Amino acid sequence: MNTRVVVTGGAGFIGRETIRKLVISGYDVLCFDLAEQIERHKNILSEIGSLGKLTLAYGSILDRNSLRDAMNGADVVIHLAAMLGVKKTEDNKLGCIEVNITGTDNVLAAAVMHGVKKFVFASSSEVYGEPDTNPINESQTTKGKTVYAVTKIAGEELTKGYNQRYPNLDFTIIRFFNTYGEGQVAQFVLAKWVMNALQGKNPVVYGDGNQTRSYGHVDDVTEGVQKILENSVSNGKTYNLGNSTQVRTLKELAQQVIELVAPEKDLEVEVLGDFNGADRIPEREIHIRYCDTS
């Protein structure tokens, strides 16, 4: 297979598993990410590279020159690179706007310059804000509550706009819901709880613990990414990617972590009732959100 795929943010959690699947399937893959990200995960990336064709390219999506070099010869771009984290992005709104909007524009422009055939944009379930109904399907109105969500809505519109002006650039938009799996950093709640349980510490839940989610495993989610890449029926469409079953409150999920990871330890879920010390912002918290993947 000679299809060349560029994955921006390829050294990230979803990026690494996406790259693994594509390399194993015979694609010629280029992982484009910040130098510190690639270096942090170089052992995993080297192991993936031993399975097939993988090129590592250091660069920022704010650097047009490095983007243009990376895009040379590309057939498909999967654009995962973004500034993440509610508190981080709310504390640095201008930085978030620059990376997630200007950066996406740069990636799209480089893709057009090199005649890329398909652009897959990684959006987020955050674009739905606090939904009117659950489960959420793709036709529901977008109404993001955070600057991160607004930048993802803008990225979706940029992607559609480029397709209008350059019809040869097909696109698909993916709205990722909560994802978990091996290799996820501990700033994310499930990974943090697992680490706490292994260390004999109680999982801590901020707020009342009744926030409701459904988590998809990264293996399933990235299988969806590959199917979107490979099927032209996805062109011009938007898809939710996540788990539409196993809906849990955060209290229930934390208890399940204890039972699965450390049943022999005398642990209990600590529900704090507020957000003091959390990386979440109370007025930005989404209470119930899970996806309809039908």
Residue ranges of model-derived segments:
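Residue-level signal for the nucleotide or nucleotide-sugar donor/cofactor binding architecture
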Residues: 62, 91, 99-102, 139, ...
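C-terminal substrate-binding subdomain of Rossmann-fold SDR/epimerase-dehydratase oxidoreductases
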Residues: 197-294
